[in-house]
């Protein structure tokens, strides 16, 4: 190894130069040591606990306590826990507090638990017998945060819906005062009064159970030693009258404690517990002030609400009528104000009455032309009323017109009428034509009791129109087999009609089973292969033929193979066990079941694709999926239409049908599913339509719930109707698509598989193969009806008066759009899946009501044909026009956007105008929800919208591991100088789905997935609609980590990003996976070329705290799945990454100009692709230098050049054999660093 002192100094410089200051999110204070460690004890007891699973806690020098519990449980009637506790008498009053930091938590197991607990009885240390005791606790249970207690039965109250994940910190406390208990988590409080919960001793402490590793710090126990003999309460300054649902206000209440020594002390709110408050019902409400065993009562008066104002928010969908029409209130929404603004709410229909001309509006028929007022009167306070006007035209009805007849015009005796598809219009004397609702006309004349032509008449307002239908008697068409016996036989077997059912078939589709029929199997020859006719006869009918097959018995050869991406001989293999079972292994990271391709261990046999089969086996799951799962692990039975080359780790795709353990995504449930992939036309995944799945059992399979601990027998079958899956003897589920495996090969490869992380043991295998030619014919199920819906896609908040209302139906139909009472469009045809836009002018600084009426076209197969009425309000507002909008962490929606009265961030984003700047004042903007810049919230090329830090500040938008990060779907935004931190698990810190955006001088860290990612934020499959022409400039991304520790990159432009996206002058380091990820999926298709210019990637794969990830760990990952995309990377540096510095990741078309790589663990440069793919790499001016013996560089098809210094395993040389010296390397490095520093 060469002398590298100079390089070490330079590397230190690089690390200091490129590492910006660390997160501005406030750090937690040092833990407060437990004052008397001898008072604390530890016990692990209860079901499923053991020395191995529940080791003694680690007591740290700072007083923190780490408890690791891989055994135990919190169940409905037992507790098995690791418990660090102290003892106090049951009559003691005290408070225990602690911070619980999650180091590991199995989020899919409801019996995993941790937190604070007070327990009545504890089990003997290291006794694993079942234990059940009264207790009260606050912490994790049922995968979320709860307050819960055991007293006869387990009672649970949700506190936080958050599932704990690695790095989360929960501030917990339990305060006991007499029989009252106050439980708190992160500021959320629950109070319980529980007499008799404890007997003699209370065991107070911290605990963990099942699969949790928790660090408890600031553990503090405070015992109240004062002897209170009485309380006095002064109500003179306290509010004692409340409206319904008004919160308790203790301001002005004086509570004084009197002690046994004769002294007295006025208490604070923290010193006493208030119980019994309930303002939900008018009347007297008695509350108790509790301190220890002493309590005082206070009577409060709860006053009923009084309606003081009504407002019509949305007019009815119909406000224009003709004489003789009935009033229709559909769509009407009324807002009530109670007690002069105390409460404002939308009323239900029973809370108000409608009157027209002094009469109830229900079924009111308009008999007078002109304008009429509809009164809206409060039923709660009839003196409060409002109203609106409707218009009645004096035009008279002239005729009815059938614009479309019903779909069904032929009937059988006894059929009910079906008017689906009938469209009727009324014509009026003013030339208008109005479509009638089904409720507006009557239909008479249908009679199916006798055959013949029937005239059906439509009636409306005294006018009629008629159409004809035909009624006939049903006729027997013949007989058919409705249940099939065995139809495939091996030589030597005899025909068996068991299970055969024959039915009469009528022309209306009815079937009636026959009991009297004969079967003639004389032509069947069980000694000779062939297809034979079995004749079925019944009196009065022509005989029918049941075909059966006789074939040679085939001994199917079983084989083992591993193939596909991420597989290897060390991770993917098959073992044949002494007990006759087959063990199929995919160790962690060994393969995957991805949306469009697979990498699997496969134990299989081959059958003819024309045949059907049933394959069953008992499955023992020894290991499956880490926690949390990463979405690509799977096991079970699989059938596929092609397999890869043995031992080849290239991308390989086929159509599949499978049953077994599967999730399909980190956010999807992981259970036993039937799933299929369709549309794949070639091994590269072209044409893939992705994976569809049906959940059979929503429980993660593992050693405890699979064979032999529990029955777990999987069955996968192919029939002429489709692919069928079944667990044990449960209900069959089916995909009615039998031909999906007839694409790539004339064979079906069927067997048992494992991927990513799964080890299974397969036994009692049963395979039955039959001839599809003679099996039961294909059943095509009726098409499932579509539930009609209408999306309103446009903004509900805007700063523009010129507005476009955008709607998108999922079925064909017609829409009418109203703005208030004004009709903007009427009965316009809209198509399923297509957007339709209606222009409107908004009233400035007001709320603008819209009503959209959608009538589905009833010629479609729908679950409902009722019209859909959607009310939608658009708030138009501006702030500080002509100036900047200021926001602060303490800003509110009621600010005016000035520096002295700032807005909150969401309001500013919703109402910023084109060309206007949102200025973020300094501070931490802590959130528990996503920050969304919606589609259509756009700037323009000339006037962007700005979201920038106040000069001299560094604001932090902290999602607190609860919010889903930033979603930027708008266009032409400029975002600068802001930190984006700690998004929720499996969500990027910042995702760009819009176009022409610039993000500059921002940092992304500690997020639950990639720091910043460019990918679509909707469901568009068209690359033209994917995010394009976005620039990321001088940004830094680090310490991003997903729960599975294998997916969070620093920056990404992958999967579904368009053209023209650029990263300039950015730095990515210490991310759990890659620095940059430009992954492309074959099934989704090529993404747009990305430019990476003057960027740096270092130390990726390891976090700043030393945590080593389980992902790829590359610096720049520049593609995926062999899809050619001409990404350009230039003037960039990669060093000290956990894997490869610059990798094409199978993309055969990367262009790399003037880049430097140094000491990357698995190579500085790896530009390769899969076998059979022609490469078109361009590598020019590449400098690769290594002092730690990494693998040699690889660039397939790149001719040697004097401009490239590639590492050959020992030294860096160019085409002429000139070796790059350390001095020359440093000079080139400094030159490039200088160039990167100049980026602005």
Curated annotation (Swiss-Prot):
Cofactor requirement: Ca(2+)
Keyword Amino-acid biosynthesis: no
Lineage top rank: taxon: Bacteria
Catalysed transformations (reactions): Eliminative cleavage of (1->4)-alpha-D-galacturonan to give oligosaccharides with 4-deoxy-alpha-D-galact-4-enuronosyl groups at their non-reducing ends
Regulation: Inhibited by the metal chelator ethylenediaminetetraacetic acid (EDTA).
Catalytic activity, EC: 4.2.2.2
Active site (record annotation): 1117 (proton acceptor)
Principal EC category: lyase
Thermal behaviour (record text): Optimum temperature is 65 degrees Celsius.
Induction: Appears to be constitutively expressed in various carbon sources.
Protein name: Pectate lyase L
Organism: Thermoclostridium stercorarium (Clostridium stercorarium)
Gene behind the chain: pel9A
